[in-house]
């Protein structure tokens, strides 16, 4: 038997913080690829520390629903799961964006744990960001390949340089594809700042995609106000919104995109999980849902 455990931060203050985790778990559960699918959180129940005791399978794939390699993925989660012999070097990620997986024993439950790198640094996240950009303009009769820029927004922090590396990594990969005329990485807490997003683009239209797992205070309040979409998030704002001679198409957190379930699956597959055609089925289902939503908006 094999199980999948999706671990995420959660929040005592924002009940919507855990919604993407449960949604993606449900999507994967429906494929039947795993005998068990569980969710666990740092700030909600079920907690990291208890989740392995709820699993019957001997082989457990743990996928962190986090954006970057850092304190939570390298220290907190392995500690709370009681992974014997864990060392960050097991991930073989010297550049901060290349974590793969490590297979270890969980000391008190006699299970083999395949501990995966965070979803946010997986190559497939570039596809999710692009898909998110498509979603905000869907049904609006626009062509993203014509005079559109893409801003990928990260939190950023001087305390963990890896926080920014994931943002730059995906911005660079998307830029190389030539899908958008311009692609820039911007941040909340370091330069270049999202407050000045219009200064970094020549394109008239800019799609702004926050590389956050869930919608919350940052994505719903801080970023819209920082960019000048509105003076007060409670009054709402237009999409697109006119700011400094540009049209800003703001998408909200990328982690709510249905295709994120694909990234979770791919992390597990990279660690050795046998999922049959589940990856292809999830991709097909999420894109079909997108097509239906776009048609409904026409």
Feature roles, as predicted:
Residues 1-298:
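Extended amphipathic ligand-handling, pore-lining, and cofactor/metal-binding catalytic surfaces
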């Amino acid at each position: 038997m094999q199980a999948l455990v999706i671990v995420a931060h959660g929040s005592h203050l924002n009940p919507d913080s855990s919604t993407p985790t449960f949604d993606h778990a449900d999507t994967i559960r429906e494929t039947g690829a795993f005998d068990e699918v569980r969710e666990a959180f740092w700030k909600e129940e079920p907690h990291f520390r208890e989740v392995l005791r709820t699993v019957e399978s001997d082989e457990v794939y743990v996928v962190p629903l986090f954006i970057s390699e850092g304190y939570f993925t390298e220290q907190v989660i392995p500690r709370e799961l009681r992974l014997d012999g864990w060392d960050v070097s097991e991930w073989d990620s010297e550049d901060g964006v290349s974590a793969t997986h490590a297979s270890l024993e969980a000391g008190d439950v006699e299970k083999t744990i395949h501990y995966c790198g965070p979803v946010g640094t997986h190559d497939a996240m570039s596809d999710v960001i692009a898909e998110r950009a498509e979603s905000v303009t869907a049904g609006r009769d626009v062509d993203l390949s014509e005079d559109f820029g893409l801003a990928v927004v990260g939190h950023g922090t001087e305390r963990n340089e890896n926080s920014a590396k994931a943002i730059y990594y995906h911005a660079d990969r998307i830029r190389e594809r030539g899908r958008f005329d311009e692609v820039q990485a911007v941040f909340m807490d370091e330069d270049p700042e999202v407050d000045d997003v219009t200064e970094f683009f020549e394109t008239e239209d800019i799609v702004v995609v926050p590389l956050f797992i869930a919608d919350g205070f940052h994505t719903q309040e801080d970023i819209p106000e920082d960019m000048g979409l509105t003076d007060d998030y409670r009054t709402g704002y237009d999409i697109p919104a006119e700011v400094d001679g540009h049209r800003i198409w703001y998408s909200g957190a990328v982690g709510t995109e249905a295709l994120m379930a694909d990234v979770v699956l791919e992390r597990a597959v990279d660690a050795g999980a046998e999922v049959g055609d589940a990856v292809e089925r999830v991709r097909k289902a999420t894109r079909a849902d997108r097509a239906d939503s776009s048609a409904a908006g026409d």
